[in-house]
Amino acid sequence: MFLLGVSAVTATYLIIQDRKSKNVNKNNDEEEEMPACTVVFVVGAPGTGKGTQCEMLVKKTADEWTHLSTGDLLRAERQRVKDASEKNNSNSNSDTEDLSLGQQIEDCINAGKLVPSSITVQLLEKGMHQAYQQNNKCTQFLLDGFPRGQDNIDAWEKLCGQKHTVVAVLNYDCPEEVLVGRLLERGKNSGRSDDNMATIRKRFQTHVEACKPVLEKYGTEGLLYNIDADRSKEEVFKQTYEIVQKIKK
């Protein structure tokens, strides 16, 4: 009985020490500041396949790059708010802070307003920091769907411009009629309500107008790379990969 008791005490002690060690490591990770990162902005109208190209690039380069989609981050943050609301679980300060950002996004969308650029940039930097902690300290990022206009540019330069370096802007260009065909085909399987003719054309025109200052600014700075997306994804990727390899040199 005594030996059993000692074993139990020893086991309990080891478990406690292990938990303490994990907590210390966790706190160290949380406190570790993300260094300056290399950033590539990836823009293009809906249906150009820019997200697919980012995924192919991550795979080809063995995770040298991390792909962050603005749209995916926004949707994930909204879902966190919904999940937390259902579970009524927002006790810790860090969770409350995270949910606060998501709640602001949810409030904007519910009110039919655009999410402020400052919130979008905060969300991107949060995603970068999380990816840095979880993905072997990766410091090279493909920001998919950003920037979408002058407001995005201004917010990025104000909040991140002094720290992270934008080395290129990949602009995937494709004729409107080709994109309409692609998105209508996608709509047959996706069930997305925004994959209809009227909405697709409106989204395309909105993108063209909003993206003008983005293309002008980075074109003037020599950072813009226009990529013809009216080809097979393999042909498009060949050009994408060549550009990224050129950037690295």
Report residues per predicted region:
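Glycine-rich phosphate-binding loop of ATP-dependent small-molecule kinases
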Residues: M1-K249
